[in-house]
Each structure stands twice: as C-alpha cells, then as structure tokens.
Amino acid sequence: MSKRDFYEVLGVSRDASERDIKKAYKRLAMKYHPDRNQGDESAADKFKEVKESYEILTDPQKKAAYDQYGHAAFEQGGGGFGGGGFGGGGADFGDIFGDVFGDIFGGGRRGGGQQRAQRGADLRYNMELSLEEAVRGVSKEIEVPTLVHCDTCDGSGAKKGSSAETCGTCHGHGQVQMRQGFFAVQQTCPTCHGKGKIIRPCNECHGQGRKQKTKTLNVKIPAGVDTGDRIRLSGEGERGEMGAPAGDLYVQVHVKEHHIFEREGNNLYCEVPVSFLMACSMAALGGEVEVPTLDGRVNLKVPTETRAGRMFRMRGKGVKGVRGGGVGDLIVKLVVETPVNLSARQKELLKEFDESCGGDAQLSTNQNLKGFFNGVKKFFDDLTS
C-alpha cells in the first residue's frame, strides 16, 4: 500500500506555513493520540502517520527533499527518525546521489578521493509533560542509548600504540579504477572502504572510533512549551565515525491532557459547573463563583442577568508563551446543572431553600458538580505537595 502524501495527511496545502503545519499536527495528534483511543489500532496507525508527516515537513532539509523527490527521498535507508522513544537520522539525501554518481564517474565529492568521515546521526527523544510542567518549565533527567566517543583509541579507531598506514590497494586515494571493455570505472576501494588508510582496529570499538553507551542527560524544558514543540541539544546525538562530529538530539514535546484545563495557544479554557439554585440567584442578584487557576483559586464576579453558558475572560491567567507575546487569558464557561422531573412541591421547597440560604445556594448533590470540585481539590493538593 503506497504512503499518503504528507501534506494530505495533515490536511494542509503545499505552501502552508510552519505555523499552519504545527496547528494541524496538534489538532490531529490530540484526535488520534493512543491515550484517547486505547485499543484502536487504526487510530494508532493514523497517529504515527501524522507524527511522521509533521517531522518531515517541519525539518527544512527533509521538507526540501520531500518537495522535490516525494517519498523516494527517504527510501534509501536515510531520512526521517526512527520510532519509539528516540531514533536515528540517516544519511543526507544529497550524499545518496553523491555515492552513486561519484562511484560511476569518479567525481561526486570534492577532490574525488578519500571519503570524509560522516557526521553522526541525529536522535529524537519523545517527552511527555504535564500541563503544569509545560507552563512553568522543568528539568528532566533522561537516558538515551547512543554511540559515543571511544576513549581507548581517542576516536581514531586504531589500536593503542599503532598508527594508520597508507592503503596498498588504492595507494591512499580511497578509490580504485576498474576497466570494463572500453570504459574505466572508478569505485570505492574495497580494502580501506574509501578512507585511504589501513589501521589495526581498536579492541574496544572495533575500528569505528565510537562505541555504544547509554548517556544520562539533564534537559531543561523552557516555560510555555506546547505539544509539537521541539528542543535541540547540539552535539548530543550519535558520535560520528573516526572522530567526526556528533549529531544533535531533538526532544519532542507532548503535553498530556489536563483534568480541568484545556489549552489553546496561550489561553486556557475551563468549565465551572454551578448548581441550579446558585444560577437562579446569580441571574437575579449577581454573585461570585470560585474558579481554579494555575496560581490558585480566585473569585469570579458574576453580574446580574447572567445566562447559562456565558464565557468570562480572566486576563493574564493563562500561559506565558515560550516565544513571547505576553501572557494568555483564562476563559471560564459557567455550566448550570439543572435538576429534572421536579414536582410542584419540590419546586416550592427548592424556592424556600434558596431563600433560606440568603441567595448563596452553591451546594449541590449533582455528581458532576461533586466530581469537579474533587478534581479542583486534587489539583491544588498536588501543587502544594
């Protein structure tokens, strides 16, 4: 089955901006995330497809390769990150064609001789954050299996005490000439593999100049990050061969759903249930309702003649974005819990009860209302613990 176009997967045009691509990714990632679709293999596949599309289209080099060559740009074992918690990047797309045409025509690379040691692959680490961690910033310790510099040979790949010798097959050129009829074809030297030198391999890294190790890193996540944001740690990817520089590590952020707040940009949204009695009282007299924020509980003044479903904006109670732009707002929606199937006597008693409370009838036996305030209590207990 052929792969779908990455732009089609995200539902954006080919000239879409990075902001539009990120917005589309966030919407689809939330829709198909495994936490929301447990046991649904179709949703899991779509989530992977959406994530792959986002990673390609937000990387300038990979996007350029895809725009020119389509999926063929990543079918040679390079391009793109692997799955799981982290993954390795492949060879640069330009190098794929450099290898092919360089071998045939004896050019391709500058100098047409010894191969340069390749920079190490980039890695990706997927990090899940709570909303509180994303908003305030946090330091996280992570473990990343990778290839690191070999201390035994100091990255040279040669056995300690030995030195590199000129390859006798290609005489240090890194290439050999093969005659086929009337044609002379230059190919990578099979003895030194294009390096021009022969070494006695290091026992620790087997001549690669690098070895497998799990690194422990302390990653500082800046305040205000959101799902889809990516943090680059320069030089923390795989070490290159034979002393070549290391690649980079990209930390991909995913913010978990919150049981009270929903984030959209730098704004937060919250639904606050109020009892039927309290709603009636506030509609006539106005009043106050307690609202949770990221900084603690605050009282929201509700004017008279307030109807059910009205939205209130609490300025400066949202998120300070990682890219600036000021602090967002908290948008509060009052949801009235209406009792049903009341008899005439019950309605009369309800009215008397409201009057006896002096108009402050915030108490409710509704389970949704109880659940909300229990959730608020847990939220603030977690903040102070």
Curated annotation (Swiss-Prot):
Q: Where does Zn(2+) 1 bind?
A: 150, 153, 202, 205
- Please state where this protein is localized: Cytoplasm
Known cofactor(s): Zn(2+)
UniProt superkingdom: Bacteria
Q: What stretches of residues are CXXCXGXG motif repeats?
A: 150-157, 167-174, 189-196, 202-209
UniProt entry keywords in alphabetical sequence? Chaperone, Cytoplasm, DNA replication, Metal-binding, Repeat, Stress response, Zinc, Zinc-finger
Q: Where's the J domain? A: 5-70
Which Gene3D superfamilies does this UniProt record tie to the protein? DnaJ domain, Heat shock protein DnaJ, cysteine-rich domain, Urease metallochaperone UreE, N-terminal domain
Return the cofactor note field: Binds 2 Zn(2+) ions per monomer.
One Pfam family of this protein, by short name?
Answer: DnaJ_CXXCXGXG
Return one GO MF term. unfolded protein binding
The record's Gene Ontology biological-process terms are: chaperone cofactor-dependent protein refolding; DNA replication; protein refolding; response to heat
The UniProt annotation places Zn(2+) 2 binding at 167, 170, 189, 192
ZnF bounds (CR-type): 137-214
Cross-referenced CDD domains, in alphabetical order?
Answer: DnaJ, DnaJ_C, DnaJ_zf
Q: Does the keyword Cell inner membrane apply?
A: no
> What note about domains is in the entry?
The J domain is necessary and sufficient to stimulate DnaK ATPase activity. Zinc center 1 plays an important role in the autonomous, DnaK-independent chaperone activity of DnaJ. Zinc center 2 is essential for interaction with DnaK and for DnaJ activity.
Write out the function statement from the record. Participates actively in the response to hyperosmotic and heat shock by preventing the aggregation of stress-denatured proteins and by disaggregating proteins, also in an autonomous, DnaK-independent fashion. Unfolded proteins bind initially to DnaJ; upon interaction with the DnaJ-bound protein, DnaK hydrolyzes its bound ATP, resulting in the formation of a stable complex. GrpE releases ADP from DnaK; ATP binding to DnaK triggers the release of the substrate protein, thus completing the reaction cycle.
Q: Describe, as the record does, how this protein assembles with itself and its partners.
A: Homodimer.
Q: What name does this protein carry?
A: Chaperone protein DnaJ
State the species of origin: Vibrio harveyi
